[in-house]
Design a protein with these regions (language model features):
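Alpha-helical transmembrane segments of multi-pass membrane proteins predominantly involved
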Residues: 1-531
């Protein structure tokens, strides 16, 4: 046990985040005419400083790669500290998840500039709510009891309600943001009731809400498992499946994505998914030790999530449906793999799940950046063509205003380099050999298979889902190389000239290629030492 006064270094990023929330709220209240770009620059600066707060732990992370070039570094990750009567816990894994969600938030902020700057006076609300939701994510990562975890989840969720609704504009494409926010609020409150009921049953049976105490009880078999405990565990984890958009609470994800801004969808598919995975690992490692009922329930949820998510994605791609619907269904299907690894509650399977989550985030950011660039250019073209002859002669508005997957047809003819980068991201999602997605799936499946003979059955569902993923990802690739019917329209479309997004997509594509060959082993070594 250490006192907080002697351990400020572990909370540098937290202090910067709290200061950022206060500063952004103060600027929003007292500096009314500040341009939107300065609010976004402030947000990016705060997030960058938060990332710098993790530098003291970098040597320890590099040391754990077991690479010779880092062998002389001094590790700074051998600790397990608790604060505030055991309600807060600092471990290497907790710090890693804090770093991961901060990095995801920073990338989301950078990619969202073109979609957020139109908020004008409401931009200060966006920056404040964005940081408050991140504060809730931090609380989830360092929580060590159910009450701290629940309060942190609610802070994140309440901020997200208003964050979604802040884009409401009945004249714009995000006119359904208010409806999406209300839907998310109602369903989330139902899930919160399940979570509280589950926590009460767990406390009634075990007499504690502290994760460390529960883990001690489970390992030493001090108290037997009871039906009441099983019900409490299932209710609690059902509520968590809502937070990550897994079966049976996954429909909200598509509604929220469809009605909200692209930046909100990216935030949910990256930061919220990562926070949900951290909560599942944190609580599952304690409660999963009692019996196999919880493990079976989560495996069932994961298998159904995998199949449903990929079936929905395949149907959307076949019909050339809405881009946001496809991104939502892809998010649902990929979180199923993460949940499947966590559900077995073994060190190797959890390590494989976290590695898959990292690869998913890289692929996800690359794909979202690509689609956001396509949509931005698409909206510019429609805006410019509304009073020109191209709308009349070629039906530009009719063809592209829906922002569906058909909008990427012929992209390879406009920018072959851009199309190649998108292909790399899609191949990783499909699990194509030599790509990081293939390495992550292979490592996940092999570790699940070692869990026992019954692990074969969930892998059959995962294999079927992977086949579906290959189908629809290759279908999207084929769209980009299809020659458009009206080539004149594409010639008039603006060139993909956003250099910063190009560089970002190139970086993500390079990571996916390099990770498939070289980076997988060092990253897995780090994760093995964390768990």
């Amino acid at each position: 046990m250490e006192t907080l006064q002697n351990s400020y270094i572990y909370f540098v990023s937290d202090f910067i985040l709290i200061f950022g929330v206060i500063l952004s709220a103060f600027i929003g209240l007292h500096i009314k005419n500040l341009a939107p770009k300065w609010h976004l620059r402030l947000l990016n600066t705060i997030l960058a400083l938060m990332l710098l707060g993790f530098l003291p732990f970098l040597t320890g992370f590099l040391k754990l790669t077991n690479l010779d070039i880092f062998s002389n570094l001094v590790p700074f990750t051998d600790y397990n500290l608790t604060f505030h009567s055991g309600s807060v816990n600092i471990t290497p894994l907790n710090l890693f998840f804090k770093f991961l969600i901060t990095l995801c938030a920073f990338i989301t902020s950078l990619l969202s500039f073109g979609f957020v700057k139109k908020l004008n006076r409401k931009i200060s609300n966006f920056t404040s709510l964005f940081l408050i939701s991140l504060l809730g994510g931090y609380g989830v990562c360092i929580s060590n009891d159910f009450i701290t975890l629940f309060l942190s989840v609610e802070i994140l969720s309440v901020a997200l309600y208003f964050l979604i609704a802040s884009f409401y504009n009945k004249k714009d494409k995000e006119k359904n943001s208010l409806e999406a926010s209300v839907k998310y609020f109602i369903i989330n409150e139902v899930a919160s009731c399940f979570m509280l009921l589950g926590i009460s049953y767990i406390y009634l049976n075990l007499g504690t809400i502290n994760f460390s105490d529960i883990n001690t009880i489970a390992i030493n078999k001090i108290l037997p498992s009871t039906p009441l405990l099983n019900i409490g565990e299932i209710l609690f984890f059902l509520a968590l499946t809502f937070k990550i958009g897994a079966f049976p609470f996954y429909i909200w994800l598509m509604d929220v994505f469809k009605g909200s801004n692209y930046s909100i969808g990216l935030f949910i598919s990256s930061v919220i998914k990562t926070v949900g995975a951290a909560a599942l690992i944190k609580t599952g490692s304690s409660l999963g030790c009692f019996n196999s009922v919880l493990s079976f329930a989560l495996i069932l949820c994961a298998c159904i999530t995998l199949v449903i998510g990929n079936l929905i994605a395949a149907r959307i791609v076949k019909k050339e449906g809405d881009i946001k619907d496809f991104l939502a269904s892809s998010s649902i299907s990929n979180i199923g793999y993460v949940l499947l690894g966590i559900a077995f509650f073994t060190k190797s399977s959890i390590t494989a799940s976290i590695f898959f989550l990292i690869v998913y985030l890289i692929s996800n950011f690359g794909l979202w950046a690509a689609f956001m660039l396509v949509v931005r250019n698409l909206r510019k073209f429609i805006l410019k063509s509304e009073t020109s002859k191209y709308e009349t002669d070629y039906g530009a508005k009719k063809l592209y205003v829906d922002e569906n997957l058909g909008a990427i047809k012929g992209v390879a003819y406009i920018s072959p380099f851009f199309a190649t980068l998108v292909v790399i991201c899609l191949l990783s999602f499909a699990g194509f050999p030599v790509m990081a997605g293939f390495t992550a799936k292979f490592y996940l499946f092999s570790n699940i298979l070692r869990s026992g003979i019954f692990s074969v059955y969930p892998l059959l569902f995962a294999a079927f889902a992977s086949i579906l993923a290959v189908y629809y990802n290759f279908k999207i690739i084929s769209f980009m190389f299809q020659k458009p019917d009206r080539l004149k329209i594409y010639k008039k479309k603006p060139v993909f000239n956003r250099v910063n997004i190009y560089i970002f997509i190139l970086s993500m594509a390079a990571l996916l290629l390099i990770a498939g060959f070289f980076l997988s082993t060092p990253v897995i070594n780090i994760l093995n030492n964390f768990i």
